[in-house]
């Protein structure tokens, strides 16, 4: 085990990505960081979001390292509709050193309606400004239409959310008392929504996934309550296919830095740290000019 990593993840915890030598040392580093963080008063309750099939393994390793730790481990039954509220209430009211749950269970704990609405409104405003810029510069009609379609989809989502009444029987993520989040296999959340005016560039993905939107909101909330010191990601492959994945990781872990440097929009980030090049590459239909 590396003491430096434990200190960084436990004390600094300003959006670290842990790159493990092996899986056991990874879990021990994160567990020790969480417990040291609590011992030093840097956090009160840590939540571990891990792959669904590894929850029991993580619990076993936690107790192996800290036999007297007070941990709560989610089972499949705990997140059945009839039991979910009760389990979340246990998290909120219990003085646990750590809570361990699977990725899919983590997604089932919603953020407050107000926070969800705020994120959608920000995305709609961003796209509206982008469409206006494109119309001014007389960009391709196809590009504008595509953005208008994305905007409409987000507006439908927002209207649906606003039409829902307040659900009194739901415990939100903010109510759990969690102030430190550890995410194992964090590359599973790489497809967060990205607005960009770039088109026809290979490897540029603007797909969105609900689980990525959900964790982005949770990361922003933790940044607010901890001063950007509440999130630790663990993955061996933070970037696998596209540069957008690097930007996405920075949005999760270094939002404050992106804001300070005025790089919170992908196009500004890409123009600072990269460049688009065109080369002849082999495509299914033969050789073609591909932008990257």
Question: What are the roles of these predicted feature ranges?
Answer:
Residues 184-185:
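Walker B catalytic acidic pair
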Residues 1-24, 28-32, 189, 198, ...:
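Conserved pre-motif I regulatory segment
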Residues 73-85, 102-108, 208-212:
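Conserved helicase motor
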Residues 64, 68-71, 76-77, 121-146, ...:
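Conserved P-loop NTPase motor "coupling/switch" region that bridges the ATPase
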Residues 10-14, 68, 89-93, 120, ...:
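Short basic/glycine-enriched coil/helix segment immediately N-terminal to the Walker B
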């Amino acid at each position: 085990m590396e003491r430096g990593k434990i200190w960084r993840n436990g004390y600094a915890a300003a959006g670290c990505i842990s790159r493990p030598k092996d899986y056991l040392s990874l879990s021990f580093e994160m567990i020790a960081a969480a417990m040291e963080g609590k011992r030093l008063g840097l956090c009160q309750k840590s939540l571990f979001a891990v792959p669904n099939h590894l929850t029991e393994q993580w619990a076993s390793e936690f107790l192996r390292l800290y036999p007297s730790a007070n941990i709560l481990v989610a089972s499949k039954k705990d997140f059945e509709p009839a039991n979910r509220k009760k389990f979340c209430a246990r998290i909120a009211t219990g003085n646990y050193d750590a809570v361990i749950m699977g990725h899919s269970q983590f997604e089932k704990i919603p953020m407050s309606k107000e926070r969800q609405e705020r994120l959608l409104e920000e995305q709609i405003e961003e796209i509206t400004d982008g469409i206006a810029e494109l119309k001014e510069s007389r960009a391709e009609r196809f590009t504008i239409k595509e953005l208008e379609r994305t905007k409409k989809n987000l507006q439908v989502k927002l209207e649906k959310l606003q039409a829902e009444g307040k659900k009194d029987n739901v415990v939100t993520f903010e109510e759990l008392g969690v102030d430190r989040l550890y995410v194992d296999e964090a590359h599973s959340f790489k497809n967060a929504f990205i607005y960009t005016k770039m088109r026809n560039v290979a490897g540029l993905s603007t797909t969105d996934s609900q689980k990525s939107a959900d964790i982005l909101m949770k990361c922003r909330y933790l940044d607010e309550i901890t001063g950007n010191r509440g999130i630790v990601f663990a993955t061996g492959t933070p970037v696998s296919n596209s540069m957008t994945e690097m930007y996405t990781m920075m949005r999760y872990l270094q939002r404050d830095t992106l804001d300070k440097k005025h790089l919170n929009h992908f196009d500004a980030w890409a123009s600072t740290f990269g460049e688009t090049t065109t080369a002849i590459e082999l495509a299914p239909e033969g050789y073609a000019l591909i932008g990257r």
